[in-house]
Amino acid sequence: KFFQRHIMKRRRSPAADAATPSASSDPMFKTLEFARSLRTIRDYFNLIDKCGEGAFSAVFRARPLTGGDRCLAVKVISQCCDLQRTCTEILLLKALKGSPNVISLVSAVREAETVLLVMDYVEHRPFVEFYRQLQPDQVQHYMRCLLDALSRVHSMGVVHRDVKPSNALYNPATGQFALADFGLAHLVQQQPQRPRPAARPAAVGSAAVFPSNKSAAASCRCASGLVCGPCLSKRPIRAPRGGTNGYRPPEVLLQADSQDCRVDTWAAGCILAAFLSGRQPFLWCRSDTECLYLLCCLFGLNSMRSAAAAVGRELRVLPVASETLPEAEFPCRRDRLSSVCRLIRGTEAGSSDGPSSSVFDLLSGLLQADPAKRLTAADALKH
C-alpha cells in the first residue's frame, strides 16, 4: 500500500529533501552505503548485496523488513538519467506485468534525486559461467524463452533495444528466465516512413579524398585533411543508436531511419551465435565501424551494400580495406555461419558432436543484414 500511494512522485518537505544524499553529485552513488542511506530503503528493505549496475543505475538484492522469504531486486536510478526514459521504463514494465519470461515490476518510488524500481528477484548466473556448458535442449529452452519474451514485448508495439546476455536472466539449474532492463525500450514509431532521396556521392577524385602520404604529412591537421569538404558540410545523421557493441544490427550501425522490433531479433541471433561458436560476444568490436567491417567479412561486401541500400544508406569502403574483404555474397548464408561457428569452436565439419543444421537455419534467419528479410520473434518461435 505504501508503494501504491507513492508511485513516481510524492510531496516532501524541503528539510527531508536536504537530508537525502544527492545521487547526481555523489561519486559513491552505486554503492550499498548510498542505497542504504535512502529513507525508503531504510524503512522498508534489508539490502543483501549488489547484483548489477549500469551507466546511471545499480541493482541490489533485498528482502522486505516485514519478513518472509520473498526476495526482491531494487533498482536505484540516478536523476542524471533522462527522466522521460525512466517514466517510459516504468510504464512499459507496468503494462508487461504478468507476462511470462519478463521481469515483473512490484512498484516504483521517487525520492529526492533518485527513482527506485522494485521488482521480483530472479535467481540467475552470469552468462559467461554457463553458455559453453549448456546441453542442446537447454540452449533450445533458453532461446525459446528469450524469443517468447520478445514476441510478447513486440506484440505491444515495444522494442527493447538492449537485448544482450546480461539482460536475459537465466538459471540453468531451474530453467527460470526473465528479460530485464527496459531502460532503452520505447514504442515503435507508427508513422509511415518518408522516402529518402537517392544518395549522391561527392564529385571529387580519390586523390582529393585519400591524399598520398607525402601530401597528407604537409596538409593534415588532426587527420582532417583525409576528409573531403562535401562530407564535412553534411548535416549529422540523427537516428536511434541505443544498444551495446556487438549486438547492434546493420540498420543501427548505419543510423537508418527505419528501425523496428527486428533490432531485437538480430541481438537474439548474436546470443545464439555465442552458444554455437563458444565465443562471447560473437561479434567482438569496439566501434560501429569495426562491427561493420566484421559483418562485411562474415557476409561479403556485396551483401552488406545491398542491406545498406535497403534501408536508404550507402556503404562505402576505403580502397585499402576493400582489398581484404570478400567481394561476392556467399551462396549459402547458413553454411557460411555454420563453418565460421565450427571454426571458432574447433569442431570439424560434419562431426556428430556439433549442432544440427536446423539451428543454423534459425541463426541465418535471425542474422539477416536486411531487416525486411530478418525473422520476427513470432516467426522464429515457429522454427
Predicted regions located by residue number:
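Juxta-kinase regulatory segment immediately upstream of eukaryotic protein kinase catalytic domains
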Residues: 3-40, 48
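Conserved N-lobe ATP-binding subsite of Hanks-type protein kinase domains
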Residues: 58
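Conserved N-lobe beta3->alphaC-helix segment of eukaryotic protein kinase catalytic domains
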Residues: 76-97
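Conserved HxN/HPN-centered segment at the entrance to the catalytic loop
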Residues: 98-107
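Activation segment signature within eukaryotic-like protein kinase domains
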Residues: 142-143
